[in-house]
């Protein structure tokens, strides 16, 4: 099973209809291959169990097993963040709409505070860590990158990216900036 492509704007292009635009490469190949050439992958090693479990339940009906133990997380990080996944609510930080995108200054403040905490912990432990700061909106990623560049994070190698541009990469620590926070329960395209 493969995660479906984002097809919110699927249109007919070059003679292909919307249904064909939604078809994944695996959807196309599997019926055309002999059974001996098809194998379902049931184990994942990249994500921590908290994130891997969420992905397994939401997309793979609980069939994807996590093989990366949470004990692999560095001790200096476990001391400050006892759980591998932390959600921080920012209900009083509404997003600001830009042309076709969004930013959220209050959430940027929270991300910077978390980075400073991680930098402090890594520095005290004399360790280095790679950190991905990921946002669903390009304007938020740009604003975060600009603010991060103004600070010093000597123990951290930080990459700021959108969800799409970070796909397939990995980091020791990931911070996801949801960006949208509103009382209308507007989810945006995420």
Sequence positions of predicted segments:
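Conserved helicase motor core of SF1/SF2 NTP-dependent helicases
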Residues: 1-190
């Amino acid at each position: 099973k493969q995660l479906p492509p984002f097809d919110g704007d699927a249109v007919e292009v070059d003679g292909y209809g919307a249904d064909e635009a939604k078809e994944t490469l695996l959807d196309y190949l599997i019926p055309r291959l002999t059974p001996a050439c098809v194998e379902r992958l049931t184990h994942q090693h990249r994500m921590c169990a908290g994130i891997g479990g969420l992905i397994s339940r939401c997309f793979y009906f609980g069939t994807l097993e996590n093989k990366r133990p949470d004990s692999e997380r560095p001790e200096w990080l476990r001391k400050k963040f006892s759980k591998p996944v932390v959600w921080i609510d920012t209900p009083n930080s509404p997003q600001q709409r830009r042309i076709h995108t969004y930013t959220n200054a209050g959430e940027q403040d929270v991300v910077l505070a978390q980075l400073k905490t991680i930098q402090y912990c890594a520095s005290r432990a004399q360790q280095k860590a790679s950190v991905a700061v990921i946002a669903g909106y390009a304007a938020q990623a740009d604003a975060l990158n600009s603010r991060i560049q103004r600070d010093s994070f000597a123990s951290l190698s930080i990459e700021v990216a959108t969800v799409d541009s970070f796909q397939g990469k990995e980091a020791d620590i990931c911070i996801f900036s949801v960006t949208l926070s509103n009382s209308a329960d507007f989810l945006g395209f995420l």
